[in-house]
């Protein structure tokens, strides 16, 4: 597992919309926009239903995550991160708690996650490689 550099942790804390890429049974990519957070040394996301992305991860845990850094006016190429990881699925009520915590980042500090409390799934991403354009690239090499 590759440690997550402080610069990438800082980016994740800003609440970037994240693209999760999984592999469909036919080998084609499946991409979903998700909320992302940190839990110790792992990136994590919460999901209340067992959607295609979860079924794909059950079959093949290899995933890619990508997210843009906040735009800097006048810069030619915006910073972004691409993370290759292996995902594991953790069923339970921790998913709602995670989504409620992330709602405060992605929506507003007083927000509550709008879905009813219940069981769901936490995807935990063990980072294998970090790429993109930004300080997290040199920090991870």
Model-derived features with residue positions:
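A generic structural signal for nonpolar/aromatic side chains embedded in well-ordered alpha-helices
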Residues: 11-12, 56-57, 102, 125
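Charged, gly/pro-rich active-site loop segments
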Residues: 2-3, 74-141
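Amphipathic alpha-helical interface surfaces
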Residues: 8, 50-53, 95-98, 102
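Helix-adjacent hinge/juxtasegments
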Residues: 46-78
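Short beta-strand segments
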Residues: 15-49, 65-68
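Extreme N-terminal tail/first-helix region
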Residues: 1-17
């Amino acid at each position: 597992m590759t440690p997550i550099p402080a610069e990438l942790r800082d980016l994740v804390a800003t609440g970037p919309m994240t693209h999760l890429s999984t592999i469909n049974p036919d080998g084609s990519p499946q991409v979903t926009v998700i909320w992302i957070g940190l839990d110790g040394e792992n990136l994590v996301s919460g999901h209340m239903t067992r959607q295609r992305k979860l079924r794909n991860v059950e079959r093949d845990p290899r995933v890619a995550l990508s997210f843009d850094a906040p735009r800097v006016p006048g810069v030619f190429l915006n910073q972004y991160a691409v993370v290759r990881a292996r995902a594991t699925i953790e069923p339970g009520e921790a998913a709602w708690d995670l989504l409620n915590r992330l709602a405060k980042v992605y929506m507003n500090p007083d927000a509550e996650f709008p879905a009813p409390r219940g069981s769901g799934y936490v995807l935990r991403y063990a980072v294998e490689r970090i790429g993109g354009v930004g300080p997290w690239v040199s920090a991870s090499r």
